């Protein structure tokens, strides 16, 4: 017989409308965890019963790892499904005996920060980052503010696959409590502010912010305005139907146009959960993560704050960036794509700066997670300190190699994840690499967050990069699609 929690508890409220048969989840084959937690279509894999089980087993694993009972932080982006998933996960966490502090709409790095600096034993963020509104995801953080290690994620998944929800609910005699604690986000706001140079003023700078209808809509404008900047905000309300749709860090066109129309000094585009940022200079030119790493790295190098002149990047980092950084006496350590791989390499090598071309930037002088808002503020501070427009700093940095990236949709999960077994594709990749020699490179990989295979080619000569990208795309479509 199922034992229900006391009336008014979030577990009771969430379960009230579910018949017992609806509380059963058929899990797909293969790992539930991708490169950034669990991600999928809301209402498909990501249902309330599934999220409740995730919360329960996450609670069990976090308690076992920390060897204590303490609160878990929950934050979320603005997607329509985020409220439902947050409450279901809160129900599961309280069913495991834990207290929940739900901070509501906030950037992912806010959850990381609060997990690290409060008495919490971990944090959970409900977001699918840059993905479209119909997707959602569940990201997990340890009490150190870092993404959960693979072995802990595996324990959560083992629990999900090993017990039925009815059995879990029969054990919920010792429920924890739920508190809405929106005010905790101010601690994160103050911490971001404290990382900036003392006395920094952005007075006189006109800055356009594309907030992507997401998690940065309140905090980013507030911080830039507090520093004296004139802020022009795009997509500046939380909207679960529009988050990331033709806006934000993966759709820069509107930001570029707004910077030019308003004669702004620079612009920043965040993704839905604000853990990444792409900048635009005063001419409307895109300033991606490679440029941000180069400029910030050069500043830290000059200040003696970049051990071994080392920056951690990924396999996507442009060759032009790498060779320019080497000319400054620096070294670039490449990892697989994913901010958790960048993070792991930074800990292993002692690097203080790392990130991705896509705009995930980590600076261990200030935080342990990628933080789009913090990165944007530091780039604005760098421009103010340099005393010249951002376009001049970019002109003096490096010339990128022409790089072409195309996504090929491959619905079959096994084919997608095991693309290396396609002999024809491997042969054609080898041909491309031989044709370009040391003047180009090929990268083919399965996305960890979307059902696509990404094909990237870069070369000194644009026609070579373009030709081989399309050729390899055709091969993927013919043999894997």
UniProtKB/Swiss-Prot annotation:
The modification Phosphoserine is found at residue 129. InterPro entries: A-D-PHexomutase_a/b/a-I, A-D-PHexomutase_a/b/a-I/II/III, A-D-PHexomutase_a/b/a-II, A-D-PHexomutase_a/b/a-III, A-D-PHexomutase_C, A-D-PHexomutase_C_sf, A-D-PHexomutase_CS, Alpha-D-phosphohexomutase_SF. The active site is at 129 (phosphoserine intermediate). GO terms for cellular component: cytosol. Activated by phosphorylation. One of its GO terms (molecular function) is phosphomannomutase activity. It catalyses: alpha-D-glucosamine 1-phosphate = D-glucosamine 6-phosphate. Mg(2+) binds at residues 129, 271, 273, 275. It is an enzyme of class 5 (isomerase). Its EC number is 5.4.2.10. It comes from the Bacteria. Keywords: Isomerase, Magnesium, Metal-binding, Phosphoprotein. GO terms for biological process: carbohydrate metabolic process; peptidoglycan biosynthetic process; UDP-N-acetylglucosamine biosynthetic process. Its cofactor is Mg(2+). SUPFAM superfamilies: Phosphoglucomutase, C-terminal domain, Phosphoglucomutase, first 3 domains. Catalyzes the conversion of glucosamine-6-phosphate to glucosamine-1-phosphate. Belongs to the phosphohexose mutase family. This is Phosphoglucosamine mutase. It comes from Picosynechococcus sp. (strain ATCC 27264 / PCC 7002 / PR-6).
